Amino acid sequence: MTDENNNDSEFAELKIRGKIFKLPILKASIGEDVIDISRVSAEADCFTYDPGFMSTASCQSTITYIDGDKGILRHRGYDIKDLAEKSDFLEVAYLLIYGELPSGEQYNNFTKQVAHHSLVNERLHYLFQTFCSSSHPMAIMLAAVGSLSAFYPDLLNFKEADYELTAIRMIAKIPTIAAMSYKYSIGQPFIYPDNSLDFTENFLHMMFATPCTKYTVNPIIKNALNKIFILHADHEQNASTSTVRIAGSSGANPFACISTGIASLWGPAHGGANEAVINMLKEIGSSEYIPKYIAKAKDKNDPFRLMGFGHRVYKNYDPRAAVLKETCKEVLKELGQLDNNPLLQIAIELEAIALKDEYFIERKLYPNVDFYSGIIYKAMGIPSQMFTVLFVIARTVGWMAQWKEMHEDPEQKISRPRQLYTGYVHREYKGIRER
């Protein structure tokens, strides 16, 4: 409860076994304030219980702000819609890492450094050959990114002076590894980066060019992918970002930390949701079957889930989904699919029906960022097993910004959550013949 005797509301009171503890209230620059419970365990001989950390702030951060009730997402104070419409991915990367938008000179230097570091060690090619041809690109990504620590042993004992170069290396090399993982999975030769192309063009070129076929990047496709990368760049302390921070708190090298983020992102409840949306739309098959599947989604005994709706944080329309809905239409119009893409037609009608249904309104289930992104990827010719890989490219920027911020935080400690133990109190060991 709030301390009514404190006019500035700087403390909360917690009563445990008859004893009152005053807990400092930490003021946020915007959004919810936070009660500091860090001394409760030492003074009250008990811990707090918060499964999934849904009510716990694990750190202080200046990078990303989310207001889920109002549908607000901001990076360093800038609205996500403004960044998606007016900026480009590397400018947003600079913003997340350094805290400010770059000047023209800073932007040019940054993009040149990213281009310079886009090549990977030639020996990495041998690692790809150890995977079978049916290997999931995310499995290859996970191994390849982790292996980078073998090629940069100087970063096993990194220093503060290494933070910025490490971030640039990671942002530069991840798209190259992503494209290599795709090429290997389809049996095509690797395509080297082309420093004459910008970041997004370069990735598309590495994905779709071949040694005997030149690939010309469609500007509408490039702009759409640029927006997708911006919209996925960071999202506060989600599962994968928290995983990167936890791994980083132990002093693990940055390549190992990003590998843990990739592993977490691979989960279908996190980075794999847009692929699940595509599978759901295919299962529905036609607009006439939407009411049937709406009913299945409402039936608690039916295993069917309406993918692409609802979010752990947003209780309003996901601002990223609003941008992607329009982007999806732009891409399909450019490709001549706007009026004849069955997945888009099902998605639009499904959204319209769900937003008018009291069941979804009461539960605040609105379309999220995954609802339209998969349709865009599919129209671009990107296979579903690559969807999460593209998420990795974008989110690496956020992971590195969060990793850098964590190491620069003077309050940084190794992460060590506690538990509520509910197992046996004590048991006597018996030999195997006595059991």
Curated annotation (Swiss-Prot):
PROSITE patterns, sorted: CITRATE_SYNTHASE
What gene, per UniProt, encodes this protein? Answer: gltA
Which is an annotated GO molecular function term of this record? citrate (Si)-synthase activity
Q: Which organism is it from?
A: Rickettsia africae (strain ESF-5)
- GO BP annotations, alphabetical order: tricarboxylic acid cycle
- Class of the enzyme per the UniProt entry, highest EC level: transferase
Lineage, top ranks: Bacteria, Pseudomonadati, Pseudomonadota, Alphaproteobacteria, Rickettsiales
A Pfam family this chain is assigned to: Citrate_synt
- Anything further noted? Citrate synthase is found in nearly all cells capable of oxidative metabolism.
Q: Quaternary structure per UniProt?
A: Homohexamer.
Q: CDD domains, per this entry?
A: EcCS_like (cd06114)
Source domain of life is Bacteria
Protein name per UniProt: Citrate synthase
- Catalysis: reaction(s): oxaloacetate + acetyl-CoA + H2O = citrate + CoA + H(+)
Q: Name one GO cellular component term.
A: cytoplasm
Coiled-coil region: none
